[in-house]
From Swiss-Prot:
GO terms for cellular component: extracellular space; lysosome. It comes from Saimiri sciureus (Common squirrel monkey). SMART domains: RNAse_Pc (SM00092). One of its GO terms (molecular function) is endonuclease activity. CDD domains: RNase_A_canonical. Substrate binds at residues 61-65, 86, 105. The lineage of its organism: Eukaryota, Metazoa, Chordata, Craniata, Vertebrata. The active site is at 38 (proton acceptor), 145 (proton donor). GO terms for biological process: antibacterial humoral response; antimicrobial humoral immune response mediated by antimicrobial peptide; defense response to Gram-negative bacterium; defense response to Gram-positive bacterium; innate immune response. This is Ribonuclease K6. PANTHER family: RIBONUCLEASE, RIBONUCLEASE K6.
Length: 150
């Protein structure tokens, strides 16, 4: 039994080193992290665009999509009819019109030398929305997760 505690502690420490890959940086709200990861008003080459995201997480994110629109326009999608998200929650909303976007996929490298392919797209998107936190823009709901691309 005495041997179990150190082993459990080691597992928790190791899990903590893996878990932050999907965690939101502590000083950011979910909406701000969504904006950093997914909003780019104009197209940008993926190697450069992903560098900023990967610097927050200290790893190469395998895939990411940038919506080429304003945060305000994307947040307006949160006011549309709610639909079911991939995780079964009912806080997702689908865009009415397609938007230009860039899909970035990791092709090689390890942090900080991550290399990505860049693919331009014009598609609909589904986002998860939640009430804003204190430092978020004063909308009824704000985007917090890019659930899917259609």
């Amino acid at each position: 039994m005495v041997l179990c505690f150190p082993l459990l502690l080691l597992l928790l420490v190791l899990w903590g080193q893996v878990c932050p890959l999907h965690a939101i940086p502590k000083h950011l709200t979910k909406a701000r992290w969504f904006e950093i990861q997914h909003i780019r008003p104009s197209p940008l080459q993926c190697n450069r665009a992903m560098n900023g995201i990967n610097n927050y997480t200290q790893h190469c994110k395998p895939q990411n999509t940038f919506l080429h629109d304003s945060f305000q326009n994307v947040a307006a999608v949160c006011d549309l009819l709610s639909i079911t998200c991939k995780n079964g929650y009912h806080n997702c909303h689908q865009s009415l019109k397609p938007v230009n976007m860039t899909d970035c996929r990791l092709t090689s490298g390890s942090y900080p030398q991550c290399r990505y392919s860049t693919a331009a797209q014009y598609k609909l998107f589904i986002i998860a929305c939640e009430p804003p936190q204190k430092s978020d823009p004063p909308y009824n709901l704000v985007p917090v997760h890019l659930d899917s691309i259609l």
